[in-house]
Curated annotation (Swiss-Prot):
Name recorded for this polypeptide: Non-structural protein NS3
Lineage summary: Viruses, Riboviria, Orthornavirae, Duplornaviricota, Resentoviricetes
Family: Belongs to the orbivirus NS3 family.
Protein's job: May play a role in the release of virions from infected cells.
Listed InterPro entries: Orbi_NS3
Naturally occurring in which organism (per UniProt): African horse sickness virus (AHSV)
Pfam families registered for this protein in UniProt: Orbi_NS3
Length: 217
């Protein structure tokens, strides 16, 4: 073996040790883990489609259209959530729906009572106001009422009391009406989420939206 061959073999085996920057082989390139691109992409596209439908359909000026947008948003949220979170929200939502419906029935009873109070207060206020107006037109009625001081005071007191009750009951009924609308919207959202969480990919659903009422109906 010649000296040139020996030198070439030596440089081949020991060249990396004499290099200024030693050669480091690259790490082994592992294959990427499989992703759920198909199913996740399909769910995201469905969620975006539902949100686009909710945002671009109408302006949502009325309460019914606002409730419809809330239902669309709940369904989009159900399609976007992972399966474990979806099932947890479904079971919690079913429990919450019972309490919300009980609260809604209680608020409707209070609202009905307030409407009766408003009607009766309005009738008494109108009657006492008419009695006070007749005293201005007819002098005989004015003299009769002036002679009976307790009757005049009673009429004015009833007028003041019923007017105050009318204003107070009107404000309270407006607040209860807002709470009723907000509660009905929450019920519609949770029922839509439960329906979407129970929906199969074929479009069937095991929990149907029954007795969902929007707006003031």
């Amino acid at each position: 073996m010649s000296l040139a061959t020996i030198a070439e073999n030596y440089m081949m085996h020991n060249g990396n040790q004499r290099a200024i920057v030693p050669y480091v082989p690259p790490p082994y390139a592992y294959a990427n883990a499989p992703t759920l691109g198909g199913q996740a992409g399909e769910m995201e596209s469905m969620s975006l489609g539902i949100l686009n439908q909710a945002m671009s359909s109408t302006t949502g000026a009325s309460r019914a259209l606002k409730d419809e947008k809330a239902a669309f948003g709940a369904m989009a949220e159900a399609l976007r959530d992972p399966e474990p979170i979806r099932q947890i929200k479904k079971h919690v939502g079913l429990r919450t729906l019972k309490h919300l419906k009980i609260e809604l029935a209680s608020m409707r009873r209070r609202y009905a009572i307030l409407r009766v109070v408003i009607f009766m207060s309005g009738c008494v206020t109108m009657a006492t106001s008419m009695a006070g107006g007749l005293t201005i037109i007819d002098n005989e009625i004015y003299e009769d009422l002036s002679g009976d001081g307790w009757l005049s005071k009673t009429i004015h007191g009833l007028n003041l009391l019923c007017t105050t009750m009318l204003l107070a009951a009107g404000k309270i009924s407006d607040k209860i009406q807002e709470e009723i609308s907000r509660t009905k919207r929450d019920i519609a959202k949770r029922e839509s989420y439960v329906s979407a969480a129970s929906m199969s990919w074929s479009g069937d659903t095991s929990v149907l939206l029954k007795e969902v009422k929007y707006g003031d109906s």
